[in-house]
């Protein structure tokens, strides 16, 4: 099983308005960590940057504007993915894994692919993700008060 655990830091909470400034995680294949990554990236030049989001991440506008350009980081990221997945094979994809990714991170990551002129996000990743927040629901149901 091919898993891509990941987390993003963004310039706000709206994927259509804000951008990514950090992409971190690990590639796990059949239970073995193959690679870790921590990409700092300049947000899309059109992205709005909110003070609240920068405070959460502990960075400044000046810092994120000094990060490597979006296109170059996108290329590094997809080069890494291509070491483990053949994007032309419909049966060879990663499961995206993380916390609250179905409601937040996946939208930003997909938008980032489009911003880099790549409409083939689904060639890399299965449409269903492994979201720890969603999985925890079944465990927490009998524990939490009704």
Task: Cite the ranges covered by each PLM segment.
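Short, acidic/small-residue loops that bind anionic groups at enzyme active sites
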Residues: 119-132
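Conserved non-catalytic scaffold segment of RNase H-like nuclease domains
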Residues: 1-112, 123
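Short alpha-helix plus adjacent loop in nuclease-associated cores
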Residues: 129-145
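Short, surface-exposed basic-aromatic patches at helix termini and helix-loop junctions that form
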Residues: 113-117
């Amino acid at each position: 099983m091919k898993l891509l655990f990941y987390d993003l830091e963004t310039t706000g909470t709206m994927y259509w308005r804000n951008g990514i400034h950090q992409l971190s995680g690990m590639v796990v294949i059949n239970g073995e960590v193959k690679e870790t990554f921590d990409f700092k990236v300049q947000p899309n030049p059109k992205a709005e940057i909110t003070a609240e989001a920068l405070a959460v991440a502990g960075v400044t506008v000046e810092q994120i504007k000094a990060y490597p350009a979006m296109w170059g980081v996108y290329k590094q990221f997809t080069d890494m993915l291509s070491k483990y997945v053949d994007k032309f094979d419909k049966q060879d994809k990663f499961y995206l894994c993380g916390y609250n990714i179905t409601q937040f991170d996946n939208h930003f990551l997909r938008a980032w692919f489009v911003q880099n002129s790549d409409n083939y996000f689904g060639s890399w990743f299965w449409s269903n993700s492994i979201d720890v927040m969603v999985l925890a629901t079944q465990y927490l149901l009998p524990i939490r008060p009704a």
